[in-house]
Regions:
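Active-site glycine-centered loops adjacent to acidic/histidine catalytic or metal-binding residues
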Residues: 25, 49, 71, 133, ...
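AMP-binding/adenylate-forming catalytic core of the ANL superfamily
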Residues: 101, 106, 119, 134-223, ...
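Short Gly/Pro-enriched turn/cap motifs at secondary-structure boundaries
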Residues: 68-73, 123-127
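Conserved beta-loop-beta connector loops within the AMP-binding
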Residues: 80-100, 139-140, 203-209, 244
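Glycine-centered tight turns that cap/initiate beta-strands
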Residues: 17, 41, 76, 174-177, ...
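Conserved ATP/PPi-binding loop(s) of AMP-dependent carboxylate-activating enzymes
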Residues: 73-76, 87-122, 160
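Gly/Ser/Thr-rich phosphate-binding loop
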Residues: 6-66, 78
Length: 248
């Protein structure tokens, strides 16, 4: 919803009754934060949680917000970021978000899936609940979302998070929505694919594809640019509005 709102002329509407804005469920690109605040004067408070837990990471009311960051761990949650061996990673390094249960389980976190011990064992092991979400932590303790572990693109030995590429593409004024996924490639294993919904009235041309590719190269890293760009009328989503990347 926020992504679509910032592409509209919000000055035509009376939004004076709105005092706070929050978001959860899917990470918002930094450009959305900037444009929404510019149009409304409101700062969006983002948070991270799952069906299996309550709000575990958040930009709580009164805290300093870093646009694009999920925030900091909520008090009482043993949030950490670990590598595939379950060891804590340093600041700035991607890893899986986990909840440590030592010395005791955290209130508000599920203990298992109903009649599914296999799924429970996959999520709960080594004294931690494994969320399956990848993020990194900055030097100020803020957590930044990268993507689901199974959404990370492995290309020529590089591990590329789709969210960073989506955020960069969303900075372009003619992009309404964007979903980044992996596409199979015989040489690189996988390559970055960007599925894009353009703002109404924008012509989907080959020149526009090249412009998008060059923009990503210039604002991230050359190996991260989408080698495949497709324009679509809409993106596949869940009932809650999340983009389904494995259907792109």
């Amino acid at each position: 919803m926020y992504r679509m709102l910032i592409k509209q002329d919000l000055s035509k509407y009376d939004l004076s009754s709105i005092h706070h804005a929050t978001t959860a469920g899917e990470a918002l690109n930094p450009e959305v934060f900037y444009q929404f605040e510019k149009a409304t004067g409101l700062r969006i408070h983002e948070g991270f949680g799952q069906t299996e837990m309550t709000l575990g990471i958040a930009n709580l009311y009164g805290a300093n917000i870093k646009p694009g960051a999920m925030g900091k761990p909520v008090p009482g949650y043993g949030i950490d970021i670990v590598d595939p061996d379950g060891k804590s990673v340093e600041d700035g390094v991607n890893g899986e978000i986990v909840i440590r249960t030592d010395p005791k389980p955290t209130c508000g976190v599920f203990l298992g899936y109903y009649r599914n011990q296999e799924a429970t064992d996959a999520a709960w092991h080594d004294g931690m609940y494994h969320t399956g979400d990848v993020a990194w932590r900055d030097e100020d303790g803020y957590y930044w979302y990268v993507g689901r572990a199974d959404d990370v693109i492995k290309s020529s030995g590089y591990r590329i998070g789709p969210f960073e590429i989506e955020s960069t593409i969303m900075e372009l004024p003619y992009v309404l929505e964007c979903g980044v996924s992996a596409a199979p490639d015989e040489v690189r294993g996988q390559v970055v694919k960007a599925s894009i919904v353009l703002v109404p009235g924008t012509e989907p041309t080959e020149e526009l594809k090249k412009e998008i590719q060059n923009y990503v190269k210039q604002h991230t890293a050359p190996y991260k640019y989408p080698r495949i760009v497709v324009f679509r009328d809409e993106l596949p989503k869940t009932i809650s509005g999340k983009i389904i990347r494995n259907k792109l």
